[in-house]
Amino acid sequence: AVIFARGECLQTLDMNQDNYMGEAFKMRNLLEGFVGEVRIIGFREHIFSEQGGAVANFAASNEFVFGTIVQRWMTWPLCVRFHYGHPDVWDRLWCMSNGGVSRASRTLHVSEDIFGGANVILRGGVVEYYEYIHCGKGRDITFAGVNGFEQKIAGGNAYQIMSRDLHRLTRSMDFFRLLSFFSSGSGFYLSNAVMT
């Protein structure tokens, strides 16, 4: 579908996302960030389904912390933010000629979006993150839905450990960036398993 898009930039959105008119006016400022080697610009999400109960409020709070504090730290000083899904904006011309925005496979790539970001870093690109703009997103409001999402993310991290792309990526990192990458991905789930 990337080849049918027009313009120089491409925004990836899910079906459960919404963009607001006021935020659309900020998009011009965001697109000015594509200078030099910047290939992905990410920004935060506002969970509009947080009023659906205690589980929905917990999921929205979890997403808020990941979308603001964690991604800000992953961008700088840790330098390990990749493409974590939506609503990132891509340099469309770059991703058309360098492998696309993700790598979908039914068996291996459960969390397919991170491989697009790893491809950017492997090819010398830069990932930025801005907080002055946000996009609306609806989350599951049932316990089973939230639990299923967490299982999908944890399973995707397990499959990432086995991937050839992330093996290549970690070979090009220094020691401190490698520790940051480990603790922001599979190390998070391993440390939680050890602590419980």
Name these PLM-found stretches:
Residues A1-L190:
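Internal catalytic domains of large membrane-associated glycosyltransferases
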Residues A193-T196:
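Membrane-embedded multi-pass helical conduit in multi-pass membrane proteins
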